[in-house]
Amino acid sequence: MTKTGGIYSAIFLVTQTKRYLYYPIKRTVYTYMSVTETRERLLATALELIWQSNYNCVGVNDICRQAGVTKGAFYHHFESKASLFCEAASYYWQVIRADLDSVFSPLHTPLQQLENLIEFVFKSKINTPNKRIPGCPFFNAGAQIGTDDEMVLEALRSLSQTAINYDIALVRALDSAGYLHYKTEPESLGRMMYNYIHGVMSFSHLQPDISTVRKDLPEGLYRLLGVKEEFWFAESATWQSEPTLSK
């Protein structure tokens, strides 16, 4: 083990089966963590900090301190905060994908899928009187990042489009089942759904009375989609799980 400037540097210990990072958790207590575990902890920590604060306010030192790793360990895995952010976007998608697959499962009717989406948004993205939920970390970050950081912007565009694809599929299902007033362009309407939901999520932070948001989000989606009035709230959500990120 080497020591520089009073701080123990990360050391790679190579075995026949696994590489490990060795770093201090406290001054006299040390632990071993595999390279894979270290990487995953950095991704999860970055996601948590960006969600609680914002992209510009969270630095490499903050991430390392919260994750309990050295900067040497950080830069072994990521070239910069921007590269970590891009991979955290992919990590975030892997975390919530199972939730969305369940919300939009074809086992549910199109109207149930719409109600499931509303339920998912309320549980995972909207504040409650007893729990502050800062919305979507990556949508919020997109509003804070300069236009010159193309790598980060491309990661955000890719993540957004992946989510929009679920909305597009829902529009097509509603249309095919005859629930909509008029024929529409699914791609355009799916994108509008995504934008509307995130606008409501942002506005909810200014609302001390969440009951207004609970009324506006469902009704706004039914209006935006052009669902025939006789089908409004005709079915209830069939997805009752807790979102993965809130567990």
Task: Show which residues each predicted segment covers.
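Amphipathic alpha-helical packing segments from all-alpha helical-bundle domains
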Residues: 112, 116, 149-176, 215
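Short, basic, alpha-helical segments at the C-terminal edge of helix-turn-helix-like DNA-binding modules
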Residues: 90-95
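N-terminal intrinsically disordered/low-complexity leader segments
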Residues: 1-37, 230-247
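Amphipathic C-terminal alpha-helical segment
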Residues: 124-128, 173, 183, 193-211, ...
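Short alpha-helical elements of helix-turn-helix
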Residues: 40, 44, 136-139
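Helix-turn-helix
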Residues: 38-41, 49-83, 87
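Hydrophobic alpha-helical connector segments
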Residues: 87, 101-134, 186-193
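Amphipathic alpha-helical segments used for helix-helix packing
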Residues: 113, 128-151
